[in-house]
Amino acid sequence: ETAYPNFPLPRLVFAFHADTEGKISGCRMGVIADEKPTLDTVMYRYPFSNVSGARGDICIGANALPKYKTPHALASLPTFLLSIPNGDHSFNALNNKLGMQYRDLLEHLKDKDPSYYYSDVLIPNGKTLKDFIGG
């Protein structure tokens, strides 16, 4: 298990459902264009693991999601989701232009600027931010 502190990431968006008791379900993640987001913003395939399908469903494995008592506390949920250990689960080399396998992709990207994703790594998925929000 290798830690990648300060790993560069493209612009990410998250969607989830919180019930009245603060229980979280239906976590999703997507990659958006490097611009001010609008409903027409282009979405890209997520190039890493633990995210699958056209909806961007996040696999949290055996990890339990915390409960959030206030809407403000939900701001920490993306950090929690990104801290879940990643493996090859739901990884597909076809989701990056380089065609690299997971470990090789991480090693290749660990010192790159996030702008590199947009020129050399990301593949549009044919969706917009409006599609992602609509679920």
Question: Can you annotate each of these PLM segments?
Answer:
Residues 1-69:
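Compact alpha/beta protein-protein interaction domains typified by the UBC
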